[in-house]
Curated annotation (Swiss-Prot):
This is Aldo-keto reductase family 1 member C13. PROSITE patterns: ALDOKETO_REDUCTASE_1, ALDOKETO_REDUCTASE_2. Catalyzes the dehydrogenation of 17-beta-hydroxysteroids. May also exhibit significant activity with a variety of cyclic and alicyclic alcohols. Uses both NAD and NADP, but the activity is much greater with NAD than with NADP. One of its GO terms (molecular function) is aldo-keto reductase (NADPH) activity. Belongs to the aldo/keto reductase family. The gene is Akr1c13.
């Protein structure tokens, strides 16, 4: 079953497939694995692929897309491709060149969605994670509302169909929404969201503004050592989740994804394994009862696997707010 058959409508009229394929890879995984995984994902039915400049795999994703278009597996118009503007390119004059660089790597004329990766600007230069001699991130003072105007221009230029944000709290979203001369609202806010961080208040806020919540880390992240505390709880081993899974004769991963989808959230599922990719697409084949949903609501701990501590010293660091 293709992810394209199940879609959520964005506030600009475009449709986003209700399940996406995530493409982040840790340093120790070779880039060839990203190419292989993206090809497999397109073969098994994913039509929504989420990537980012910072993941350093846009070239591989582009190769996968082109090879599957040439092979007749997919048409460009059936795909929904997202990439992200990195924090070192928030200065207004850097936005369009950054998008054009991503498009070139992806071998695409346009992306379906372009989003600001974090609300926090970093110093531009040769390094994507610039630090000072003490190892602290080199942060910048750009107002993300100025950056947003350049995203609007990229949409008008036809380089992107929809524009959105990621990792914004409700106050930061409010600033964009209340910006004088706002031309386009963000269509989405992509945030960490899963059973241990169910983002209820942020979801309510976003729904009230017709902004879709897209979830990364939907299965409790892939627990990569680079970013995630290895002593943190393993979401998919949660006994309550496992009980609900057993009752529904489904895997814990499918239950975790279904929980998000039933709340109107668009989850991103990441895997390098074909059997997991196929299984995750079965999320549309069943429903959780109101009783199960209530049980799963009870797992929320407001626990964040990915606190983005490298940005913590900036006044726009988003996770100091409750939501």
């Amino acid at each position: 079953m293709s992810s394209k058959q199940h879609c959520v409508k964005l506030n600009d009229g475009h449709l986003i497939p209700a399940l996406g394929f995530g493409t982040y890879k840790p340093k120790e995984v070779p880039k060839s694995k990203s190419l292989e995984a993206a090809c497999l994902a397109l073969d098994v039915g994913y039509r929504h692929v989420d990537t980012a400049y910072a993941y350093q795999v846009e070239e591989e994703i582009g190769q996968a897309i082109q090879s599957k278009i040439k092979a007749g597996v997919v048409k460009r118009e059936d795909l929904f491709i997202t990439t992200k503007l990195w924090c070192t390119c928030f200065r207004p004059e850097l936005v369009k060149p950054a998008l054009e660089k991503s498009l070139k790597k992806l071998q695409l004329d346009y992306v379906d969605l372009y989003i600001m990766h974090y609300p926090v600007p970093m110093k531009s230069g040769d390094n994507d994670f610039p630090v000072n001699e003490q190892g602290k991130s080199l942060l910048d003072t750009v107002d993300f509302c100025d950056t947003w105007e350049r995203l609007e221009e990229c949409k008008d230029a036809g380089l992107v169909k929809s524009i959105g944000v990621s990792n914004f709290n409700h106050r930061q979203l409010e600033r964009i929404l209340n910006k004088p001369g706002l031309k386009y609202k963000p269509v989405c806010n992509q945030v960490e969201c899963h059973l241990y961080l169910n983002q209820r208040k942020l979801l309510d806020y976003c729904e009230s503004k017709d902004i879709v919540l897209v979830a990364y880390g939907a299965l409790g992240t892939q627990r990569y050592k680079e970013w995630v505390d290895q002593n943190s709880p393993v979401l998919l081993n949660d006994p309550v989740l496992c009980d609900v899974a057993k009752k529904n004769k489904r895997s814990p991963a499918l239950i975790a994804l279904r929980y998000l989808i039933q709340r109107g959230i668009v989850p991103l599922a990441q895997s390098f394994k074909e059997n997991e990719m196929r299984e995750n697409l079965q999320v549309f084949g069943f429903q959780l009862s109101p009783e199960d949903m209530k049980t799963l609501d009870g797992l929320n701990k407001n626990f964040r696997y990915l606190p983005a501590e490298f940005l913590v010293d900036h006044p726009e660091y988003p996770f100091v707010e409750e939501y």
